[in-house]
Amino acid sequence: MQIRLEQLAAQLSKGLKGLYTVYGDEALLVQEALDTLREAGRKEGFTERTVHTVQGAHFDWTELLAAAQAMSLFSDRQLIEIRIPSGKPGRDGSDALQRYCDALNPDVLTLVSLPRLDKATQNSAWFQALEIGRAHV
């Protein structure tokens, strides 16, 4: 479901989804959306936050998959941010993101941030997995 930034607060008042994809070419608007989602998550008890930034081909996707399934030591619910500044996770990342979406943990709120994406990327299998039944801003 596509949500515009000005609609985000109203949408969040109806409840959080498990995964949000935030992308665009306006860095300030992307940051505002992420801040709004983080605050909504905190209010719902997602107090432990981990950030994974994908930088090149050396990112450990298995660590991300394990983090999503691990129980938190300090809180019941956790927020995981996945930042993909290049907008291209690569073949391993594509597979990992699809597996991640197939096994979403209800005690994990996931925020995926990306730059503006071209049509080919939006039609890719990994991006479609992020979209199906979820929200993107």
Model-found features: residue ranges?
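Non-catalytic interfacial helical region
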Residues: 1-6, 10-13, 17-19, 27-134
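An amphipathic, basic-hydrophobic helix/alpha-beta surface used to engage anionic
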Residues: 22
